[in-house]
Amino acid sequence: MSWSFLTRLLEEINNHSTFVGKIWLTVLIIFRIVLTAVGGESIYYDEQSKFTCNTHQPGCENVCYDAFAPLSHVRFWVFQIILITTPSIMYLGFAMHRIARQPDEQIRRLEKTKSKKRAPIIHRGAMRDYEEAEDNQEEDPMICEEEEPEKDSEKGDKKKHDGRRRIKQDGLMKVYVLQLLFRSVFEVGFLMGQYVLYGFEVIPFFVCSRNPCPHTVDCFVSRPTEKTIFLLIMYAVSALCLFLNLCELFHLGIGGIRDALRQKRKEIQESRKKKPSAPPNYHSVLKKGKLPNGKPVFPGNGVSEGFEMPVHELDRLRQHLKLAQEHLDLAFHLNPSADIAHASRSSSPEANSIAAEQNRLNLAQEKGVGSREKSGL
């Protein structure tokens, strides 16, 4: 008997199943298909020819064997394998049809996302302020490209999972659970049928009184102990497959609950709005230009628009700016290096502070002029 076609189908099921499903498939192939094909055929090949009765009445042995085994053990197990694998084969056909119907653009997009490399980071050079101060008659680039080193994000994207997320993403979860339920029902049904037909033991002799036997005759079975052991093994394999089906259902249920909780927690985290962070050295530059309530004076700020700086504050700012400018001029005269001077002017904290205070002064003057015009009207 050839099992190649069924084996190829079961191998395709392995690509669309969970980790527990792969274990079930291994048990099915090794302990059911191979064991039934190899061990069953060799053990039960002479089950009827070696079934002898202590009579020479024609037809009596055939009738007694039919009463002893209404269905051959091997044929029963082959029929069991076919019915149990039918839901999985139907699921495989549906999965292949569902995946084939997906748009080609979506498939190409997924492949492009996997194979896409990170684009280089383009930004303004960090040392451009200092390079501009160089008088080397060379044009410095305004932007520079920096290739970001490959991180272990691919490992994070390729999280090790047992195929449950892939089944869910392909929209096959309901069909997968349905075929698990059918498999479990078939397992229970065949376990009960095997017990009703054969029990847990192959008896060494069978008493038969059917027609056309002239009287009650005793019939003897070949290798009853070996057949009993093989029968118990098939009981254990069926129970193991049923247990794996129940474990897989439990695993899918727990995984679905975890995904729901994780999605809810992610939505809560996304709903919390984070305050925008200021650029580097922003607060250090504007720390002197704060209002009495602690907010910086900045155009567009609703609080600063209604704030008018007093006259004595304006005078104090003018004096401070004048004094700071004198200190800077004195420092520049003492240091004749134009490069250092230009770099100091462009990047020194004092120059940044003076620029910020000058902006404050201009803003305050504009506010004062505007308020005087309104009062004059």
From Swiss-Prot:
Superkingdom of source: Eukaryota
GO biological process, one term: cell-cell signaling
TM region(s), chain numbering: 19-39, 76-96, 175-197, 229-249
Extracellular compartment residues: 40-75, 198-228
Family stated for the protein in its record: Belongs to the connexin family. Gamma-type subfamily.
Main function: One gap junction consists of a cluster of closely packed pairs of transmembrane channels, the connexons, through which materials of low MW diffuse from one cell to a neighboring cell.
Protein name from the UniProt record: Gap junction gamma-1 protein
High-level lineage: Eukaryota, Metazoa, Chordata, Craniata, Vertebrata
